Amino acid sequence: MGQMTVQIVTPDGIKYDHHAAFVLVKTVDGEMGVYSGHEELIAVLEIGEMKVRRVDDENHVDWIAVNGGIIEVNKDIITVISDSAERERDIDISRAERAKLRAERELEEAQTARNIDMEMRATVALQRAINRIRVGKH
């Protein structure tokens, strides 16, 4: 099995840079798995988990909370560009749970006030918090 280079880039810089045998991401069209030699493409990512099976240890999987963005597959180089991304080991679950509660309160307030913009922001914040909790518990 071949290997790929996987990089995740955010406005804060490179958040992840490793060799991988397999990558799984959530795109707007559904889940997409990528192996070495995959057809070149660019796809839009949803808020979701990114699974990276490393080449240095067949059983080692890195989980990353990705908050949307794009993925580019070009030969055996995978680049993800996202507003933010956080590895499983770096997630503070209690902080993410507090963010979830805050987003739920904001969503309820927005629905009561019938404020669509506020509701959309709260919904995204809730999705991000849930994603971070899910990834942090792997």
UniProtKB/Swiss-Prot annotation:
Keywords per UniProt: ATP synthesis, Cell membrane, CF(1), Hydrogen ion transport, Ion transport, Membrane, Transport
Gene Ontology cellular component list: plasma membrane; proton-transporting ATP synthase complex
GO molecular function, one term: proton-transporting ATP synthase activity, rotational mechanism
Compartments where located: Cell membrane
Principal localisation: membrane
Gene3D superfamilies for this protein: ATP synthase delta/epsilon subunit, C-terminal domain, F0F1 ATP synthase delta/epsilon subunit, N-terminal
Annotated membrane topology: Peripheral membrane protein
Subunit structure: F-type ATPases have 2 components, CF(1) - the catalytic core - and CF(0) - the membrane proton channel. CF(1) has five subunits: alpha(3), beta(3), gamma(1), delta(1), epsilon(1). CF(0) has three main subunits: a, b and c.
Function per UniProt: Produces ATP from ADP in the presence of a proton gradient across the membrane.
Listed NCBIfam families: ATP_synt_epsi (TIGR01216), PRK00571.1-3 (NF001846)
Name of protein: ATP synthase epsilon chain
